[in-house]
UniProtKB/Swiss-Prot annotation:
Origin species: Anoxybacillus flavithermus (strain DSM 21510 / WK1)
Assembly and oligomerization: Part of the 50S ribosomal subunit.
Function: Binds to the 23S rRNA.
Molecular function per GO: rRNA binding; structural constituent of ribosome
Membership in a protein family: Belongs to the universal ribosomal protein uL15 family.
Keyword Ion transport: no
Protein name (record): Large ribosomal subunit protein uL15
Gly residues bias spans: 21-31, 42-51
Lineage: Bacteria, Bacillati, Bacillota, Bacilli, Bacillales
Region feature Disordered, mapped onto this chain: 1-51
GO biological process: translation
A GO CC term assigned to this protein in UniProt: cytosolic large ribosomal subunit
Keyword entries, A-Z: Ribonucleoprotein, Ribosomal protein, RNA-binding, rRNA-binding
Annotated SUPFAM superfamilies: Ribosomal proteins L15p and L18e (SSF52080)
Domain of life the protein comes from: Bacteria
């Protein structure tokens, strides 16, 4: 086989259908759009959720709730992830970022209690769940809110 003999796999490339190029093509004259009507026009067609003029579902249902513009999103760290550190390590947000436990600090770090903690660590974070705090202290470590 030579370079000039290379061909795409059969069926992997389909020729583009050019419409409006004569009736012999099967897609001439009206270009597959039928005669007149909304869908034959440029920009024709209805928007998503259109129900033929009937009040659509999204307008029949009431509005609910709001978006809290002051919402803080914390980077989540589970206890399991803290086992990678040596005994007696002071775990800070900077260390977690450095070691790749979290990819972004966001509004801070929140430690959650998923998994087992076997190491004695000093953990500094912005928030702790009750179960995480309990588990860290049970393992002989300390927690510090920053």
């Amino acid at each position: 086989m030579k370079l000039h003999e290379l061909q795409p796999a059969p069926g992997s490339r389909k020729e583009r259908n050019r419409v409006g190029r004569g009736i012999g093509s099967g897609n001439g004259k009206t270009s597959g759009k039928g005669h007149k009507g909304q869908n034959a026009r440029s920009g024709g067609g209805v928007r998503i959720g259109f129900e033929g003029g009937q009040t659509p579902l999204f307008r029949r249902l009431p509005k609910r709730g709001f978006t809290n513009i002051h919402r803080k999103e914390y980077a989540i760290v589970n206890l399991e992830a803290l086992n990678r550190f040596e005994d007696g390590t002071e775990v800070t947000p900077e260390l977690l970022l450095e070691t790749g436990v979290v990819s972004k600090l966001k509004a801070g770090i929140k430690v959650l209690g998923d998994g087992e903690l076997t190491k004695k660590l000093t953990v500094k974070a912005h928030k702790f769940s009750a179960s995480a705090k309990e588990a860290i202290e049970a393992a002989g470590g300390t927690t510090e809110v920053i």
